[in-house]
């Protein structure tokens, strides 16, 4: 049998503990420091979750960059397998034309550089015209439609070596299956290097 003095001491010591336990139970769950309790579903999820796969795929937009083939100096042939040229996410190169993989807005661009030894002095010198054009062939238009076009005239002009560059680029609304190609006048004067002659497009 417990002595009366010791029983009274045990009751006195246990009273503060019971009071603290009661106060703790009266607090809301989030204030008790319980993990994941009382938090909204988004806050209770782990922070290392990966984004949905469909969002990651949506960032892979079609793009293409072609360079001129130096092995065909009499005609401008495009290639996509060398010198930082590429085809990505649906673009195809067929019959020297880019095939548009999906409908949407695209930035289309091209550059050519012409060079020559000089204009020969004559009483009536023959003009030398240079031109470069990006064309569209679509099911909506059964013929090649110019998208970008530029012309330059060199002769009569300088007696020494000359260089002329043409860069063009703009945004177009294209349809899946459209074909992008180029037409060039003055191909024997093309300076066929990857940094001088190129053609490409990318989705916005």
From Swiss-Prot:
GO BP: cell surface receptor signaling pathway; defense response to Gram-positive bacterium; humoral immune response; immune response; lymph node development; positive regulation of canonical NF-kappaB signal transduction; positive regulation of chronic inflammatory response to antigenic stimulus; positive regulation of extrinsic apoptotic signaling pathway
Protein origin, superkingdom: Eukaryota
Lyase is among the record's keywords: no
UniProt GO molecular function: cytokine activity; tumor necrosis factor receptor binding
Assigned GO CC terms: extracellular space; membrane
Localization terms from the record: Secreted; Membrane
Pfam families: TNF (PF00229)
Domain THD as annotated: residue spans: 62-204
Residues modified by glycosylation: 95
Cysteine pairs bridged by disulfides in the record: 119-155
Residues of the signal peptide: 1-33
Keywords: Cytokine, Disulfide bond, Glycoprotein, Membrane, Secreted, Signal
Chief place of localization: secreted
SMART domains attached to this UniProt entry: TNF
InterPro entries the UniProt entry points to: TNF, TNF_beta, TNF_CS, TNF_dom, Tumour_necrosis_fac-like_dom
Function: Cytokine that in its homotrimeric form binds to TNFRSF1A/TNFR1, TNFRSF1B/TNFBR and TNFRSF14/HVEM. In its heterotrimeric form with LTB binds to TNFRSF3/LTBR. Lymphotoxin is produced by lymphocytes and is cytotoxic for a wide range of tumor cells in vitro and in vivo.
Family affiliation: Belongs to the tumor necrosis factor family.
PANTHER family assigned: LYMPHOTOXIN-ALPHA, TUMOR NECROSIS FACTOR FAMILY MEMBER
Subunit structure: Homotrimer, and heterotrimer of either two LTB and one LTA subunits or (less prevalent) two LTA and one LTB subunits. Interacts with TNFRSF14.
The protein, known as: Lymphotoxin-alpha
Taxonomic lineage of the native organism: Eukaryota, Metazoa, Chordata, Craniata, Vertebrata
